[in-house]
A protein has these predicted regions:
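Catalytic cores of alpha/beta
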Residues: 27-29, 70-81, 107-116, 137-138, ...
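Hydrophobic faces of well-ordered beta-strands that scaffold small-molecule active sites
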Residues: 12-20, 40-42, 68-72, 82-84, ...
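C-terminal alpha-helical cap/extension of soluble enzyme domains
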Residues: 2, 17, 144-209
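Surface-exposed amphipathic alpha-helices with a cationic face
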Residues: 5-8, 54-65, 90-98, 132-144, ...
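Conserved, mostly hydrophobic/aromatic
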Residues: 32, 40, 163
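Glycine-rich phosphate-binding active-site loops on the catalytic face of alpha/beta enzymes
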Residues: 42-44, 85-92, 119-130, 164-193
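N-terminal active-site wall of soluble small-molecule enzyme domains
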Residues: 39-97
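N-terminal amphipathic alpha-helix/helix-capping segment at the start of soluble metabolic enzymes
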Residues: 1-27, 208
Length: 209
């Protein structure tokens, strides 16, 4: 597994999350990591072959775990990071340092986030949606007391550029994306972070978290 004390720092510093089926991760993920992915959300679609899926995850942890956070969508596979999609109620964590993320559907989940979750995924489209505005206003991305959140959707470099111009600093590519797309998106967000007035103070805070 990843180093326990670094999990919170790593989610605070993450810019690009990619979502893809766990079964495809062995082939696709190495390239996406090179492209700049910081988090991989590995989905099972509710059909878990625990022995097979655990082996895939452990192999990924062994080869890529120091370069990105590996998240799963089910409590049936023990992982340092898990995402609760709508309808999932099990908030169990395998250890006290494990991270839980929530895919939000309501404004209240952003304005008054549940303390059980260490990060959120907010629908990133359409641009200027009520949920996106609520996240930008109530959880400014590089404010130290904000819950880190990702604007999620089938995003490309153009839409990420538009999001970054509104203040978004993290994105979650629900369709995974190509290596080239991830490279472009990572560059857009790297520049946006560097130009953000809050960046220097936030960086120091996040590294020490």
């Amino acid at each position: 597994m990843t180093v326990m004390h670094s999990l919170r720092s790593r989610i605070l510093l993450a810019r690009v999350a990619v979502q893809l089926p766990l079964a495809e991760a062995g082939d696709r993920l190495p390239g996406l990591v090179i492209g700049g992915a910081d988090v991989a959300v590995l989905t099972t679609g509710g059909a878990v072959d625990r022995r097979r899926d655990l082996k895939i995850l452990r192999d990924l942890e062994r080869y890529l775990g120091q370069r990105l956070l590996l998240a799963v969508d089910t409590p049936e596979i023990v992982a340092d990071v898990r995402v609760l999609f709508p309808g999932e109620r099990d908030r169990s964590r395998p250890h006290q340092w494990a991270l839980l993320g929530q895919v939000v559907q309501e404004r209240g989940q952003i304005v008054e986030p549940d303390g059980a979750f260490q990060f959120l995924a907010v629908p990133g489209t359409p641009l200027g949606s009520p949920l996106l505005r609520a996240a930008l206003e109530n959880q400014p991305p590089l404010r130290q007391d904000s819950v880190p959140w990702f604007a999620a959707g089938g995003l490309d470099a153009g839409s990420v550029q538009a999001l970054a111009e509104t203040g978004v600093r993290r994105v979650w590519l629900t369709e995974g994306g190509t290596v080239e797309e991830v490279e472009q998106i990572d560059e857009i967000l790297r520049w946006a972070w560097g130009e953000d007035p809050a960046y220097e103070d936030y960086l120091g805070f996040a590294v020490r978290a």
